[in-house]
Amino acid sequence: MKIIGIESSCDETGVAVYDTALSGFAALRAHSVYSQVALHAEYGGVVPELASRDHVRKLLPLLRQTLAEAKLSVEELDGVAYTAGPGLVGALLVGAGVARALAWALEVPAIGVHHMEGHLLSPLLEDDPPEVPFVALLVSGGHTQLVAVDAIGDYRLLGETLDDAAGEAFDKVAKLMGLPYPGGPQLAALAEQGIPGRFCFTRPMVDRPGLDFSFSGLKTQVLLAWRNSDQSDAIRVDVARGFEDAVVDTLAIKCERALDTVACQTLVVAGGVGANKCLRARLQAMCRQRGGRACFPRPALCTDNGAMIAFAGALRLQAGQQSDIAVRVTPRWDMAALPPLVSRSCRR
């Protein structure tokens, strides 16, 4: 099956073609992403109405571009996958509307994909994918979750943030230190120049049982340290380093605790913060020390993209699942409510 995937949940327009007849990363025939960062920069954050309108402008040209790169005509497609949630309702409706219209015109099945399932499955696009069961850390601007993956499509939430997501904390700390939008990646780049230990911030919630996270208190602690400093460039890089180390340590401690909880040695990390170099190195070292394995998508597939939607959609379409003809999106959507790809009774 040749499946086209459409991602439009927030401020990236993504389109990709996945071919189930091929294996490994070669199965991704083409993928294109258009980022709206420049559009939203002057507002310091994503403006939902502007995001929706820009998806309208960019989606059809991106579809044509991606099909051309895949050397396919639209008539050769066997199915359509699209992000149905969670996300911004207007942005989701743009992608869902185009996807449903395309599927109807081609008389092929369509499937609405959970955005975070797309992220979770993105490391499986690589040539040496992880095998289930595994623990997944989903870490982005909107989510920080630990999920036990007993089988593809069978997910148990182990823990999540009680307030700010890790990526959101990165962006907010960057903003309070005067870095331009989007600040998270710039903060991480500054942290590489900082001196470890110059600023030592709390590792939140690691001193209590459980697998939940909280980053709002850490954000406030960094704010106070910054305000009480001379706010020089030298201090900025050291504060950035201290903050990043605190977040990375917290995520690593909770990931190891999650692996122990489910007696598993494979960790999958996905989402925008999964591209962070310090986090990757720390989690890889932790898993190696345990005799396990940490798996990541390549950095280009950590941010929102159509490839993960095409892949996740292909798995569900191959399992015989499809969405009805109505254009429906789910801005808030619990991943544990997704139907399994294989009956749970068949796996016992």
Swiss-Prot record:
Family: Belongs to the KAE1 / TsaD family.
UniProt: substrate binding residues: 138-142, 171, 184, 276
Predominant location category: cytoplasm
Catalytic activity: L-threonylcarbamoyladenylate + adenosine(37) in tRNA = N(6)-L-threonylcarbamoyladenosine(37) in tRNA + AMP + H(+)
CC cofactor note: Binds 1 Fe(2+) ion per subunit.
Pfam families listed in its UniProt record: TsaD
Organism expressing this protein natively: Xylella fastidiosa (strain 9a5c)
Needed cofactors: Fe(2+)
Binding, Fe cation: 115, 119, 304
Protein's job: Required for the formation of a threonylcarbamoyl group on adenosine at position 37 (t(6)A37) in tRNAs that read codons beginning with adenine. Is involved in the transfer of the threonylcarbamoyl moiety of threonylcarbamoyl-AMP (TC-AMP) to the N6 group of A37, together with TsaE and TsaB. TsaD likely plays a direct catalytic role in this reaction.
Chain's gene name: tsaD
GO molecular function list: iron ion binding; N(6)-L-threonylcarbamoyladenine synthase activity
Protein name: tRNA N6-adenosine threonylcarbamoyltransferase
Assigned keywords, A-Z: Acyltransferase, Cytoplasm, Iron, Metal-binding, Transferase, tRNA processing
GO cellular component annotations of the record: cytoplasm
Keyword Membrane in record: no
